[in-house]
Design a protein with these regions (language model features):
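Residues forming the Rossmann-fold NAD(P)(H) cofactor-binding site
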Residues: 41
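Patatin-like phospholipase
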Residues: 1-35, 45-387
Length: 387
């Protein structure tokens, strides 16, 4: 069983709500294969580092999200101070961090060090959970800005590497740097140096977000998306009148990077599964069906963010003035680490999971990990998984 937690900045708090309900309803359930992309890497790393059953782990995850504030993610200052610091270095000797990205994220590193690390920078507890057999692999997805490749960093037992022209994997001992890199929203947060290269958000070029879990041997994948599935009527509704504001354009770009790929990959997996069902085993070329369940918000998280737009301060207030207003400020929903918004998303996630209890229970039935020999046959290299 694999768990995929996709990106979306502050939207990832929605996943914490879903997981909290799963922990309460299925406390003995475990996900041996964890994959995190973008802010989903924080949630995946939390599950991979903390001991206890699913209920205990998810309760601590929710507590961590409820504690977070904008000042725990990026340097919080007035919009005027931010503009001055971004445009002009205060001294010749000052590091040029603020020119590498709009926001400086050293507070997030400090926060993650307190929550996930043993003080050395390594993710505490992962080795113990691997040794106990509770965990098979933890994977964190990043983008190598130097090569343009999607790089998946994996800590696990006897994991075979994969390599394609545009996506590769490396076996390693995961650290806070890997989590920071995966969550580094392009242009907004600075890239993170790992070795000789700089890495950013794992969703930038990730055309097949389900692929890492499949490579790692998952025969079932539960994916928690942060994208609301609009109805046709909602999709046809104009978001603004006149020329599109910068916020609308930027939001669409962010959605295309972090939210749209999972839907396309899920559709491709469904088609491949249907095709394999029609073929005898000897003609499947080593491929096998992979069961998939995607859970997603019942409401538009961007529209929820609009309720808080008038209350933001610091850099977000300046961004709001520059970007203009829209009915669904998706860009804001990714940066709005305010307690009220985070709490609301956790509540929505919990309620959504509870209302889909029967569907989830049916999917989780008989969720046993396949033998390793079979897991190696699970590489799904058809269309959509060979980018």
């Amino acid at each position: 069983m694999g768990l995929l937690l996709s990106g979306g900045g502050a939207r990832a708090s929605y996943q914490a709500g879903v997981l909290k309900y799963l922990g309460e309803a299925f406390p003995t359930m475990r996900f041996p294969i964890l994959t995190g992309v973008s802010a989903g890497a924080i949630n995946a790393a939390h599950l991979g580092t903390h001991s206890g059953d699913l209920k205990e782990c998810t309760e601590r995850l929710v507590d961590s999200w409820l504690e977070i504030s904008p000042g725990d993610v990026y340097q919080s200052e007035s919009s005027i101070s931010w503009a001055k610091n971004y445009l002009f270095k205060r001294s010749r000797d000052e590091p040029d961090i603020t020119r590498r990205a709009f926001l400086e994220t050293s507070p997030l590193r400090d926060y993650l060090m307190r929550k996930l690390s043993d003080g050395t920078g390594r993710l505490a507890g992962v080795e113990t959970r691997l040794a106990s057999g509770f965990l098979q692999a933890l994977a964190i997805v990043t983008t190598n800005y130097t090569t343009g490749q999607t790089v998946t960093w994996v800590q696990g037992s006897d994991i075979e590497r994969w390599e394609r022209p545009n996506r590769v994997s490396f076996n390693t001992s995961l650290t806070i740097d890997h989590v920071m890199a995966s969550t580094a929203l392009p242009l907004i947060f600075p890239a993170i140096q790992i070795g000789d290269a700089y890495y950013g958000d794992g969703g930038i070029r990730l055309a097949a977000p389900l692929a890492p879990a499949v490579h790692l041997g998952a025969n079932k994948v539960l994916a928690i998306s942060t994208r609301y599935a609009r109805s046709r009527a909602e999709a046809d509704e104009p978001q603004f009148v006149g020329y599109p504001p910068l916020g609308q354009i930027f939001g669409l770009l962010m959605n295309s990077i972090f939210l749209d790929a999972l839907d396309q990959d899920a559709l491709m997996m469904d088609r491949i599964n249907a095709l394999l069902d029609e073929l005898p085993r000897r003609k499947r070329l080593g491929l096998r069906p992979v069961e998939l369940l995607v859970l997603r918000p019942s409401v538009d998280l961007g529209r929820l963010a609009s309720e808080f737009e008038t209350t933001v301060t610091g850099p977000l207030a300046l961004f709001s003035r520059l970007f203009g207003r829209s009915k669904s400020p998706d860009w804001l929903s990714m940066l709005l680490f305010e307690n009220q918004y985070v709490t609301r998303l956790i509540e929505v996630g919990y309620t959504d999971a509870r209302e889909q209890h029967d569907r989830i229970e049916g999917f989780l039935e008989d969720s046993e990990l396949p033998p390793r020999s079979e897991a190696h046959l699970a590489e799904l290299d058809g269309p959509g998984h060979n980018s």
